[in-house]
Amino acid sequence: RVSDAADFLIFENAAPYMLARKVLRASSNPPVGRIAYGSGHQVGKSIEYIALLEAPVRNVFYVGDLDMRGIYIAAKLQSHCAANDLARVHPATVLHEQMLASANRLGAPRGWPDQSRRTSAAGDWVFQFLEPAIRDEIKTIFDSGHRIPEETLTESDLIGCFSSW
């Protein structure tokens, strides 16, 4: 728990979560109350515990690697929560946008090769999780066999994202 705010932020992976937790704890006005990491597909098993938290959770924001697995996990989580009347799950769009900008800053505007070779062939329904403004760009990255990991987010990136949340 980092504040009394009613929003919950979930990262797919541990390293970006730990960096974000550090940034949020140092903030005088964190935009989210709780932060966690889902450990990939494990998030689907643990999300139901949100209902047991003392303070109510208004919204869950999810950010994962911009690859097919990361978006699939988010879309399945959103669907599961909607079907079971749990907190609403939204994309952490400001973080996704920053991941795209970070990849560009690092000289890889289309990301890096995805060794899993998973493309958007898994179904366009998965992309409905993403905000329309970035959906096509991310789909193009996937279709080219590339990905952008959460680990592109730096401490200063996160400070900027959280201050404009």
Annotate each predicted stretch with a short phrase.
Residues R1-N59, R69-I71, A75-W165:
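Nucleic-acid enzyme cleavage-core boundary/entry regions
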Residues D65:
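Catalytic palm subdomain of template-directed nucleic-acid polymerases
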